[in-house]
């Protein structure tokens, strides 16, 4: 489980096509400092399992279902990604509980910056609308946000 608080911005180094998956290599000195094979790291909110961790970079295998339900399939070498290590027992927990299971991709409609925050309007896939409630939380690219004023199809987030 995760908190939705981004620890580090990593950089995709390589994507390797496997028979039934894609192996992604991400440069991430902070989140890899104590990572071991089998550990979970959220990559733009998607829970991935570390396959290898060498010299500040980790690799993980991404199956077709995950590529289809997330943006991971659009990444290229040089893409920047939000990263967070899994929660540890006894650790302070800010943010919200985030599982790292991706249900779909939203489309950004507009972005309006202000002095202390930014309001982002986006549309959700219709099949997900019933799961979103006013003042509820949702993770967008691994960052946990709260709804401020949802409308039937456009969801306003800040």
Q: Can you describe what each PLM-predicted range is?
A:
Residues 2-39, 115:
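Intrinsically disordered, low-complexity, positively charged segments
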Residues 22-23, 107-122, 126-137, 146-149:
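Intrinsic, low-complexity N-terminal interaction/targeting segments
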Residues 40, 46, 80, 84-87, ...:
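Short, surface-exposed secondary-structure boundary micro-motifs
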Residues 49-53, 88-96, 146-149:
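Short, Lys/Arg- and Gly-enriched loop/turn segments at beta-strand edges
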Residues 64, 68-105:
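Ordered, amphipathic secondary-structure segments that act as subunit-interaction surfaces
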Residues 147-158:
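Single conserved hydrophobic/aromatic residue that forms the stacking wall/gate
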């Amino acid at each position: 489980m995760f908190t939705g608080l981004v620890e580090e911005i990593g950089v995709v180094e390589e994507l390797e096509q496997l028979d039934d998956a894609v192996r992604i290599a991400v440069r991430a000195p902070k989140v890899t400092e104590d990572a071991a094979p089998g550990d979970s790291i959220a990559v733009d909110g998607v829970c991935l399992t570390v396959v290898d961790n060498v010299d500040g970079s980790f690799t993980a295998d991404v199956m077709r279902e995950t590529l289809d339900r997330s943006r991971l399939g659009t990444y290229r070498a040089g893409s920047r990604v939000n990263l967070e290590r899994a929660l540890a027992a006894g650790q302070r927990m800010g943010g919200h509980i985030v599982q790292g299971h991706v249900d779909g991709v939203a489309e950004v409609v507009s972005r309006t910056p202000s002095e202390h925050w930014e309001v982002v309007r986006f549309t959700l896939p219709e099949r997900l609308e019933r799961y979103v409630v006013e003042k509820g939380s949702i993770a967008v690219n691994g960052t946990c946000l709260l709804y401020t004023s949802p409308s039937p199809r456009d969801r306003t987030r800040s």
